């Protein structure tokens, strides 16, 4: 385990990075290097689910019990 014992401590660097971005009023979920990919995936899933449920609810209100057919 000498690699683990002699590993450099990167916490102060990352802490400075996050604190600097936070001082510039950047939202926490937009600071990280992968945040764009994560937020894009989340937004697609969230709005896709919302749209699908609104579509299904409107079909149910109109009296159709299936997604596509007129039955």
Swiss-Prot record:
It is found in: Mitochondrion inner membrane. Residues 1-35 are mitochondrial matrix. GO terms for cellular component: mitochondrial inner membrane. GO terms for biological process: oxidative phosphorylation. This is Cytochrome c oxidase subunit 7, mitochondrial. Belongs to the cytochrome c oxidase VIIa family. Component of the cytochrome c oxidase (complex IV, CIV), a multisubunit enzyme composed of 11 subunits. The complex is composed of a catalytic core of 3 subunits Cox1, Cox2 and Cox3, encoded in the mitochondrial DNA, and 8 supernumerary subunits Cox4, Cox5a/Cox5, Cox6, Cox7, Cox8, Cox7a/Cox9, Cox6b/Cox12 and Cox6a/Cox13, which are encoded in the nuclear genome. Component of the cytochrome c oxidase, the last enzyme in the mitochondrial electron transport chain which drives oxidative phosphorylation. The respiratory chain contains 3 multisubunit complexes succinate dehydrogenase (complex II, CII), ubiquinol-cytochrome c oxidoreductase (cytochrome b-c1 complex, complex III, CIII) and cytochrome c oxidase (complex IV, CIV), that cooperate to transfer electrons derived from NADH and succinate to molecular oxygen, creating an electrochemical gradient over the inner membrane that drives transmembrane transport and the ATP synthase. It is a single-pass membrane protein. Pathway: Energy metabolism; oxidative phosphorylation. Pfam families: COX7a. The keyword Aminoacyl-tRNA synthetase does not apply. Its main location: mitochondrion. Residues 59-71 are mitochondrial intermembrane. The chain crosses the membrane at residues 36-58. It comes from Neurospora crassa (strain ATCC 24698 / 74-OR23-1A / CBS 708.71 / DSM 1257 / FGSC 987). Keywords: Membrane, Mitochondrion, Mitochondrion inner membrane, Transmembrane, Transmembrane helix. InterPro entries: COX7a.
């Amino acid at each position: 385990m000498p690699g683990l014992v002699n590993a450099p401590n990167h916490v102060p660097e990352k802490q400075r990075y996050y604190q600097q971005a936070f001082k510039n009023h950047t939202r926490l979920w937009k600071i990280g290097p992968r945040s764009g990919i994560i937020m894009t995936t989340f937004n697609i899933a969230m709005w896709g689910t919302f749209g699908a449920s609104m579509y299904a609810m409107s079909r149910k209100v109109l009296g159709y019990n299936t997604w596509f057919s007129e039955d």
